[in-house]
A protein has these predicted regions:
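Glycine-rich phosphate/adenosyl-contacting loop at the front of the ribokinase-like
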Residues: 1-60, 261
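Ribokinase/PfkB-type carbohydrate-kinase core domain
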Residues: 2-12, 74-89, 100-213, 244-245, ...
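A glycine-rich beta-to-alpha transition motif near the start of alpha/beta enzyme domains, typified by
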Residues: 56-85
Length: 281
């Protein structure tokens, strides 16, 4: 089962992605052997995957400018069948991200231009039954989250601000949160499920029922950019009614993005899901 109307809330910006062997020492030159430009930001990445799965999804988050980069983002939403009616347009430069991907697929991000942005008020965005929020937007919507209807399934991608509000599912890298903090969030009932992910180690699903270890397929990571977003997008799209299968699908989505740098199709997700092992830890 999927949700009927999904809102992907968070960062909206063009990405400039540079593939390099490694970052130089301070003061050195960065030489890239390949680059690409794409519509990015967590809200965009999640919505792009969900729309690709044929589901109804919209975006909201930071304002964008009426400049060339803003036009580029809108054109992408139109071409991807993503609802953008809630986006705020302001007289400022559209924020951007420069992403440096090393030979191991790990990324270093420079984000710019968010200081001038306004953010959507969640109270003004209605008629969604599933909400995906990213860690960067939390400072601007923290109070709004506390008033979101309990009928809305909330997925958070990433962890930065302390969680003092109720969410259903947290998808987070092991680098962003430790197990002690994850267990606290579960025990104090701020979060129902936490999926701790890693690019090269087994993932963990933590809940009040215990811990499950998830062994992903042996994919070589070529670009981890957007892999966590694809994982969160799957949970935000399909929820936890069929928990084990949906967690497998979420992990498969992330693995496909990291290993191929392509949008995961439902057919490919099903194929890769069969290679994922889940067992009690």
């Amino acid at each position: 089962m999927s949700f009927n109307n999904i809102l992907s809330f968070g960062t909206l910006n063009p990405d400039f992605i540079y593939f390099i062997d490694e970052l130089p020492n301070l003061g050195g030159d960065i030489r890239s052997y390949k680059y690409l430009i794409r519509a990015g930001g967590t809200a965009t990445n999640c919505a792009e995957n969900i729309a690709n799965w044929g589901l109804n999804v919209g975006v909201a988050g930071n304002s964008i400018g009426s400049d060339e980069f803003g036009e580029y983002m809108i054109k992408h939403f139109e071409n991807s069948n993503i609802n953008y009616e809630n986006i705020i347009f302001e007289n400022h430069d559209t924020p951007t991200c420069s992403i440096y991907v090393d030979k191991n697929g790990e990324r270093t991000i420079i984000s710019s231009g968010y200081n001038f942005c306004k953010w959507n008020n969640l109270k003004e965005v209605k008629n969604f039954d599933s909400l995906i929020v990213d860690r960067y937007s939390i400072p601007f919507i923290k109070q709004d989250l506390e008033s979101v209807s309990h009928d809305v399934f909330i997925t958070q991608a990433g962890y930065q601000e302390e969680i003092t509000y109720k969410i259903n599912f947290l998808v987070v890298s092991k680098d962003e949160i430790d197990v002690i903090e994850a267990n606290r969030l579960i025990n104090e009932e701020y979060v129902d499920w936490i999926l701790l992910t890693s690019s090269n180690l087994p993932a963990r699903l933590i809940s009040k029922d215990g811990v499950l270890e998830i062994t992903p397929p042996d994919f070589k990571t070529i670009n981890s950019t957007g892999a966590g977003d694809a994982t969160a997008a799957y949970i935000g799209a399909f929820g936890v009614e069929n928990l084990i299968e949906n967690v497998k699908g979420a992990c498969a989505s992330g693995a496909i993005v990291a290993g191929t740098n392509e949008l995961p199709t439902m057919e490919k997700i099903k194929e890769v899901s069969e290679l994922i092992e889940i067992k009690p830890r």
